[in-house]
């Protein structure tokens, strides 16, 4: 019987493609205040600043290239087509690496959405949004991003996917961002869990269940994928 594999990725995997993260010492929060660019209140107060911020991030994301970790996950899906990727990342590096079955928890930088219906999105052509552009429903388009403090629309689906995992691979996340970090709680008792992180993780609740691979994503993911494929 084919094993169900779930890959859960965070900012660290994209950082190895050159994209800035928020929480590192030299991260985005050193240059921008969360309250100014990534909350619903910020959007109401100064939408142009939010648009400019996400235009910058979109330009950077589209200039970045998928790395060996993204490509290894795509190879894993070639062998195990039912493999599901759940990502906290808003870039499209997984898709550009050839991945399918990608669930974005925090939105997608390449899309804009209606302000009346968070799930009603449109693709943006290029990297630049112009504030004031309208959705077909008449509302002003905003970045398709889950702002801090907003509900995560895909979280229930992510929990359902995690609950079906035989193998869960966690890469590029410190497991400090909730509710996404709680996904491990939904993994079945029999599931094998691998955490790929160059740093020693804080695994208070999962230490007895998690196999820690201490390596960067671009080294740890290809090595683990190769091992899983060899078992077939």
Briefly describe each language-model feature range:
Residues 1-232:
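Conserved catalytic core of sirtuin-type NAD+-dependent deacylases
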């Amino acid at each position: 019987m084919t094993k169900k594999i779930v890959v859960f990725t965070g900012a660290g995997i994209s950082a190895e493609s050159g994209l800035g993260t928020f929480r590192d010492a030299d991260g985005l929060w050193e240059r921008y205040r969360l309250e100014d660019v990534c909350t619903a209140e910020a959007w109401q107060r100064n939408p142009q600043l939010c648009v400019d911020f996400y235009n910058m991030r979109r330009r950077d994301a589209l200039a970045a290239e998928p790395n060996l970790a993204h490509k290894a996950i795509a190879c894993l899906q070639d062998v195990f087509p039912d493999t599901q990727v759940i990502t906290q990342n808003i870039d499209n590096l997984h898709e550009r690496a050839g991945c399918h079955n990608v669930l974005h928890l925090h939105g997608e930088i390449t899309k804009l959405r209606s302000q009346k219906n968070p799930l009603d999105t449109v693709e943006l052509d290029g990297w630049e949004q112009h504030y004031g552009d309208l959705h077909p429903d008449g509302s002003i388009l905003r970045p398709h991003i889950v702002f801090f403090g907003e509900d995560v629309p895909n979280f229930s689906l992510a929990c359902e996917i995690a609950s079906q995992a035989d193998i869960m691979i966690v890469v590029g996340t410190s497991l400090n961002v909730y509710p996404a970090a709680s996904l491990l709680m939904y993994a079945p008792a029999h599931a094998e869990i691998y955490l790929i992180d160059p740093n020693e993780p804080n695994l208070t609740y999962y230490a007895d269940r998690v196999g820690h691979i201490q390596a960067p994503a671009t080294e740890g993911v290809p090595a683990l994928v190769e091992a899983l494929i060899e078992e077939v």
